[in-house]
């Protein structure tokens, strides 16, 4: 019985892991970056957030992770995911 349960657990784990797709990363530069951002931000219906929203709390740890870098640094100089792009909307 334990063997059957162990095999079933292993099979379900393997099946679950095989269905998990890693998020694709691409480089986005120039017009391709601008068009992609326009499409993503429009589809997400997200308004541009300003750093002032975070700074008003007075804590540096509330600043967004990418506050020191720009979108070109993160997505043109090296590949990035759609989640990273959406964080700039």
From Swiss-Prot:
Q: Does the keyword Secreted apply?
A: yes
What are the UniProt keywords, alphabetically?
Cleavage on pair of basic residues, Disulfide bond, Hormone, Pyrrolidone carboxylic acid, Secreted, Signal
What is the first-listed, main subcellular location in coarse terms? secreted
Keyword check for RNA-binding, yes or no: no
Q: Name one GO cellular component term.
A: extracellular space
Which range is the signal sequence, renumbered to this chain? Answer: 1-19
According to its UniProt record, what is one Pfam family this protein matches? Answer: Insulin
Q: Where in the cell is it found?
A: Secreted
The entry's propeptide annotation covers: 50-68
Q: Which residues carry this modification: Pyrrolidone carboxylic acid?
A: 20
Q: In Gene Ontology terms, what is one molecular function of this protein?
A: hormone activity
InterPro entries of this UniProt entry?
Answer: Bombyxin, Bombyxin_A, Insulin-like, Insulin-like_sf, Insulin_CS, Insulin_family
Q: Which PROSITE patterns match?
A: INSULIN
Q: Which domain of life is it from?
A: Eukaryota
Give all cystine bridges in this chain: 29-76, 41-89, 75-80
* Assembly and oligomerization: Heterodimer of a B chain and an A chain linked by two disulfide bonds.
- Give the protein's biological function: Brain peptide responsible for activation of prothoracic glands to produce ecdysone in insects.
State any further remark. Answer: Silk worm has two kinds of PTTH: 4K-PTTH and 22K-PTTH; there are many forms of 4K-PTTH.
Task: Report the family membership.
Answer: Belongs to the insulin family.
What name is this protein filed under?
A: Bombyxin A-8
């Amino acid at each position: 019985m334990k063997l059957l349960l162990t095999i079933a657990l292993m099979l379900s784990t393997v099946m679950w892991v095989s269905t998990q797709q890693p998020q694709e990363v691409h480089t986005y530069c120039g017009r391709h970056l601008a068009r992609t951002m326009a499409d993503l931000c429009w589809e997400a219906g997200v308004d541009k957030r300003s750093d002032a929203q975070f700074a008003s709390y007075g804590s540096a740890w509330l600043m967004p992770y990418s506050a020191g870098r720009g979108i070109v640094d993160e997505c043109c100089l090296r590949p990035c995911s759609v989640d990273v792009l959406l964080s700039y909307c």
